[in-house]
């Protein structure tokens, strides 16, 4: 966010000092040295509310009042939640039914079987299935002393080329030395009618399997020890479209959490909001009715360990979600929304907890009224059920020590043994047009985030002056100072990082103050430093 860049100037004071005061080349060790006092302007910058929060979150009304608008997904359920087509194999065996041998002529169709294959899809009762991905493997295990041609015909299926069958062959084999072959068919785009041969079943595919001796061969003597095994293997099936009855069951979502980045830069302090709105939206891309029972929606602040549960009538009863509309080549999802605000909930307390996570738990009832579509539930590969949150927070607020924090590593010239900066005083000239005072802190921390030392900052940036309408009518000027001792400079050069914090407090703690897009703070930073000339050896 932009605030990292602007408040980063504060964090980089010391690094910038050293950069500006560094002299070019290393001096000879016998050169004379002397110290001088220098006054150097370092930084001049300005920032608005768009530099304190991500610009993409900021909207304004015609009066310039700032509103934060944050959108986030709460949860999402996709196709594999409702339909998972497992790998499935069907095996067919032929053996001579008598303890004798028979001489079959070339081209003889010695094995033929009509069958219905039933797929195990648990609660789902599908009538139509169109595949996006998948393959069909026809495997043959031959112990007959002739090349054998095997055929798998699927009257209930239509391949993309319009065909319904696949054929493969396997070389001659014997009981002691069988031969094998595998043919593979890409099933992408294949449509299956799963109503069976009488069109009154579900999850059922009509199948015909056959095998004949090579028409160009010599025929074969077949004994009771000879056999042929054919297997049809459906692998890696991913539906593009499915229609049927998807069952009546409950799917649990959560308990789980999602990250919330709205308050990422805030580490402490309190926030009191005048108004806030949360819009809960649900989009159903599945062709079945849903009933949602919200169990919990929580604002979790992992920094403080505090959790605030949202209270609203939405938790008292089910939410009924209509099914999507099937267009034949796509779908129109159904939409649901509910507006939660300070008049019907504790949304203000929910957000004032400054959450960095949202916790949720809910139950999804599929087809709560049963098969009211008469087996016409549907889904597409692109179907999903998703719930989202839209937070709208007009910046009419009271803050007390609401603290932004950044950590940075200064890019210092030279090294701990070869720098010439001895000490200095930083001055920050602030012209503040916000209705909030700003208190600055600078800490030196180690690689683990533990504080080593503090750079003391004296003074605060006073809040702008309020008029009768509680808007800033005049900006105020303040001067802050920070002493950089020789010890602090040495700590910086020893590898410490800078943690800068800015704590904002509204000037009126009894009324919610509006933040306008036009409010601005101007900053100028100067350095009065003691520098050892020829001392950077």
Question: What do the PLM-derived regions correspond to, one by one?
Answer:
Residues 1-23:
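Sec-dependent bacterial lipoprotein signal peptides
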Residues 25-537:
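Extracellular/secretory-pathway and virion-surface proteins
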